[in-house]
Each structure stands twice: as C-alpha cells, then as structure tokens.
Amino acid sequence: MKRIGIAINPSKDNENKIVQMVKDKFNEKFDLEEIIVFNSYETKNLILHKPLDLIVVLGGDGTLLNVAREISKKAYEVPIFGINIGNLGFLSSIDISEIDKALNKLKNQEYSLEKRMLLNCIQENKEPVIALNDVVVARGTLSRMVKFEIFID
C-alpha cells in the first residue's frame, strides 16, 4: 500500500485531531508515498491523477454512504475502509477505538474485501441516483397512486 485517501466529515473533527492521529498511525505502520486528505462533502470534486490503494472514511454511516456513492460515480475502483467517529456506524469497518488492532490486521493482510452492489434509482425526468445501502421512496405532498417498475439483472 503506497497511496491512500482519507475522507473526513469535518463536523465530526473540526480541529483535525482525529485525522492527524489517523495519518500518524498509517505512516507508522506503512511506507506510504502519499496521503490525500479531503473533505467528505467535497468527494464529488475529487480528481485523482494516480489511483489510490485505499480510501479511509472518517465519520458515520452517512459519510460512508456519501463517499461510496461519489467514488462509484467516478468509476474509481478502490477499497473503502470506514472508521466510525459518528453517531451511527453500522456500515463502518471499525470504531476509532479499534484503529491499532485494525491497522495491524491490514498490515498483515488479515482481512477480506467485500464487493457491494449498488442500486441505480431512475425517476422520470430526474437525474439517476446511485445508492449503496438503500433507496427510500416516499410520497410527496399530494396523495395519489404510485406506479413502480423494479428490475434486477
């Protein structure tokens, strides 16, 4: 592993103490050439000139889902490692308190990669929405019949 990205939810680490600690721990364990830190809200503006070996997402489930969605739109094939520093962390790989143990496993290649399917939600006259976990369909302000067409390939 030579190049990693760290996506941080700035509202969870407004003094950058957590992101600095994570950078230091990765630098201690790995001989990294580059760490790119970016605001998770700005993932859609991320331009990579060289591929990353890993993206670390610091935040909660919402942060992880946002980063995964935006990375998939760019067709970057890169593993995402979620570290929960938020309130909800069902999708994250670990909690921040487990970082030392997790990085040891990562260094010793004691992990597995999970491929996740994405949902593509297309609404008439709207931009398609890509989702990792779920898509919520809710009625608007007017009560009326709703017609759904759901496909799987």
What are these regions (language model features)?
Residues 76-92:
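Short, acidic/small-residue loops that bind anionic groups at enzyme active sites
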Residues 1-54, 58, 96-112, 123-129:
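ATP/NTP phosphate-donor binding region
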Residues 31, 76, 117:
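Residue-level signal for beta-strand positions within conserved beta-sheet cores that form or flank
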Residues 88-153:
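Catalytic core of DAGKc-family lipid kinases
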Residues 26, 71-75:
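Active-site catalytic pocket residues across diverse enzymes, especially alpha/beta-hydrolases
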Residues 63-68:
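Short glycine/serine/threonine-rich phosphate/pyrophosphate-binding segments
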